[in-house]
Amino acid sequence: MVESESSSASIEIVVEGRKREVAEFAVRRSLPSIHRRSVGPFVFIDHFGPMAFPPGKTMDVLPHPHIGLSTVTYLFEGEIIHRDSIGSLQPIRPGDLNWMTAGRGIAHSERSTDEQHIKGGRSHGLQIWVGLPTAKEEVAPTFAHHPNATLPTLRHGDADLKVIAGEAYGVSSPAIVSSPIFYVDARLEKGSLELPNDHEERAAYVVEGSITVDGRTFDAGNLIVFRSGKQGILRGSANAHVMLIGGERLDGPRYMWWNFVSSRKERLEQAKREWKEGLFAKVVGDEREFVPLPDH
């Protein structure tokens, strides 16, 4: 459900995540939405879990391609093994950041660990895509991992914050990004937190608990997009967990199809052909399976 908030002082729109199925598990997808395609350069938000899976039933995302974007994986629970076509092999655990820039093309997989296959386990996290500026859409693919302990934390207002990527509240993440952004993990006690106001577009996604904005309460699964230039103040319930995102708008419209993002429609068609014809480099160490090109 998408609801306009034209009568609100600071809220532009609220997007309620739609349920989708990915790798046989339910996720909530907030972006893209029919009424809101992006927030700054953030073009995709999937929230998976919290969920438990039994032995033999794991959360495996098979090898698949990307172009024109950076994928950002961040966990609250569980563990995932990342592999890609440039040879990266990296476990990601709660609080870590995996930042993969697809550029002109990369394939990757994200799978449960061997122990989870045997014993079962839990999983909870976010998968986010950040569109690349036009001049950087065709850069060589890269991958970077930032352990939890390397990401800066601070206390601001009534919230404990971690700056995952970009810059916020006077603190910068070590992650290298392609445009001015902020991506912040906020744990808000009863009290308030003001959003950074130095970016063109800003939003707050409720992971757990609830927050109040302009006298209205929003539960988990809601993405609250704020009006540009307006003060955004969140008031939290006990143990509210919120992710803050924002940045400058992309330099022109973006076209999205499946896992591909580009400023040019013909580039999407090229990527489709290349994946269908097996021209993407294979995921190193995970060459036997792949996600086929969808029919539509």
Regions found by a protein language model. Give the residues of each.
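Jelly-roll (double-stranded beta-helix
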Residues: 1-296
